[in-house]
């Protein structure tokens, strides 16, 4: 606290002890005083600490093979997509490492950004791939839905709201947000409604594609801090999108017909080989996708040009769905086993039960996303009863439980203890 000097009512700074005559300004608080020099010093310390914490570091950037191996721990299948994503992400952050799009001191080559387009049906892991990448690299990550976006000035969300989600994910640390990853889902829903340009304005289709162009390429965008529409009397957050990696995904229903028409029957003459539509399944067809197919689908050339990396994810078959249930680090079976373990009960699935769950997911057409819903339905009654019972040691889920809603097998605690004792005696 400031003290009075010998010469009268002379106030002193509570921090450095200088009198009001020795400083330019002395600011009073409730019982304390601070001088302008101490304020400047505090500002310097804070700015130094913030600049150190803000600067994202990519000194130990994992190699593409390491990125792919990390994805293998969480994502089953989709080898082509994982390889393409690993290379694209590595090149993107290597580009940031050497100074972004600026030219290096010993080279005149300018490194451009490579955004990614993921094509594939629902429930195949498009969103999960992007989430897992962001978690590995420890960068801010945001998911946006393209169906909610409209052109500026119309009812709906502006494209800048996507950037606000990323800033919020980075705790409003703009420097960190500028090296983050944004995943835009349902990108196929903003395709132009007709192949020919129309006189009527397409505010949720082509208009949104036009609005996204600059953000995808790299620009300094003005983002309203509270979201919503812009108005001239509000402050904006300035964010540079040059080093933000955009991954966009969509199911692109009907695109396979456009690809088939291009690669289908091209033969001419008696000796030409004709490739019928039956020769290729949907996964094979999508693997032949070209930018021209996306243009026919309704994406504008400028938009497709800003997504140089195009890769596909395939529908999950029965074997892949069973592996998803059991193999990843956070596999669904392990999650539910852990939940039961907290009630001191073992949960067991027979092989045919897992096959039945996978078959149900295929029938519903929901892919891996539907597995949890099926598991919840199967385990609902037993999860309701088990916490209130102390006599159950193990719950066994069989095929009949999944398909016919039969009660699961409950193994009493006494029999489990007796078996364990017999085993110990024989040993």
Swiss-Prot record:
Boundaries of every ClpX-type ZB domain copy: 1-54
A biological process term (GO) from this entry: proteolysis involved in protein catabolic process
Molecular-function GO term, any one: protein dimerization activity
Residues bound to ATP: 121-128
GO annotation, cellular component aspect: HslUV protease complex
Cited SMART domains: AAA (SM00382), ClpB_D2-small (SM01086), zf-C4_ClpX (SM00994)
One Pfam entry name: zf-C4_ClpX
Positions bound to Zn(2+): 13, 16, 35, 38
Record's keyword terms, sorted: ATP-binding, Chaperone, Metal-binding, Nucleotide-binding, Zinc
PANTHER family: ATP-DEPENDENT CLP PROTEASE ATP-BINDING SUBUNIT CLPX-LIKE, MITOCHONDRIAL (PTHR48102:SF7), ATP-DEPENDENT CLP PROTEASE ATP-BINDING SUBUNIT CLPX-LIKE, MITOCHONDRIAL-RELATED (PTHR48102)
Functional description taken from the UniProt entry: ATP-dependent specificity component of the Clp protease. It directs the protease to specific substrates. Can perform chaperone functions in the absence of ClpP.
Protein family according to the UniProt entry: Belongs to the ClpX chaperone family.
The protein's name: ATP-dependent Clp protease ATP-binding subunit ClpX
Gene responsible for this protein: clpX
